[in-house]
Amino acid sequence: VKRTALALAALLLAGTAIPATAADAPSKAPPSGDFAVTNVTVAIGDGSAPIRGGAVVVRGGRIVAAGKDVAVPAELPVIDGTGKWVTPGLVSAMTDLGLVDVGAVEESNDSYAGTARFSAGLDVSLAIDNDAPPVAVSRASGITRAGVAPIAANAIFAGQGAVIDLAQNGPDAVQPRAFQLVELGERGADLAGGSRVAAQALLRNALREARELAQRKPGKDTEGLTLGQPSDALLSRADAAALIPVVTGKQPLFVHVERAADIRGVLALGREFPALRLVIVGAGEGWRVANEIAAAKVPVLASALADLPGSFETLAATQSNVGRMTAAGVKVALGGFYDNDQPRYAPQFAGNLVGLSRVPGATGLSWGQALAAITSIPAEILGGGSTFGSLKPGFVADMVLWDGDPLEISTGAVTIFIDGKPQSLVNHQSRLRQRYRYPKESGLPKAYE
């Protein structure tokens, strides 16, 4: 993988997320969901190496076969993939897609509720706008499904995230209330009153109150709003009811921590609340406790480029973090893409980890592992491990056809399918590029005259 001057490349990409060959027009492909792609390099997304000269067969919007020596039925329309690569649609497990239109405009930002009376009870699926410009930008870059999470504002619990597909004119929320997000570490300490001790006490008390509420009304989860809370309860009825799926194991608990000691504290939660389905978000020092994370079978959403200490809780940060955790047996997905349309950088970050594997003394990922970190592993974390994120038979046909190696910085998406249906690559950025690529003199008066 050709990777040099990574920091400079990241800056250059900020304004040119979509290559000039893409996003000029909707994809030209069979709309029926029944087709085949042949003579293409196939990347399944399960960690295996890419397969050259392969094919993919799709029927009814689902994968029938993918790989080498695949029999293509004669009656199917065929897309010639000569010189191209095909991968599963990219999956980003932690974003604010659909919650923010313009980051600098407060009125268009629903990711942060600074004065809300609720915390765990917040449900972002009710505010997601699939027509928000960052959604189209991310789709044109190969993102087909994403987790959408709120940002913790005035309590350690941020609220309930959703899983969406990015199909044009598609449903806003595929899976509402897909996970709960809680802040610990330095941010959680600040929200809890100034210390990690307070944050841990608040978290454990909240989980106990939710467990007690569930025991008083068996079989109820977020519908338990009609139940009263004890007079000494710290949580509102709505927040306690929203945590019942967490303590009963029906909803994953995403916990944002960075420091090794804080990660150990998260793993200890499982001893008191054995039904918890934990996911660690951040884990900047995860490599220091990688064996413990692997033994607990807790997946991680981590940044690929966190190689410098940005705070006291990331003093041991290293760009080898993801590679070391993966080598220890931890399932690691690349995630945490906030700031509007930044999920588009996922292939670049994954490619950086491939390049890192060639740096003496560093630990990166193989090509197959890197692709899995932005496809099948985040899909599994979001609960779609048997549905999307791979080109295995039976999976939905979320596919991206690329004009080269998708982990190369200069490669762009050519055709994108979600559920086997071709998607438009047109977005606000591509329209601006087309408008000003070849500017023409207009007969209208200048605005400054």
Could you tell me what each predicted segment is?
Residues 7-17:
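Bacterial N-terminal signal peptides
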Residues 19-27:
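Boundary at the C-terminal end of the N-terminal hydrophobic targeting segment
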Residues 27-30, 42, 46-87:
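Histidine-rich, glycine-flanked metal-binding segment
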Residues 40, 44, 54, 380, ...:
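C-terminal cap of metal-dependent C-N hydrolases
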Residues 102, 109-115, 120-121, 252, ...:
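His/Asp/Glu-enriched, well-ordered alpha-helical/loop segment
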Residues 131-134, 139-277, 412, 418, ...:
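Polyanionic/metal-chelating signatures
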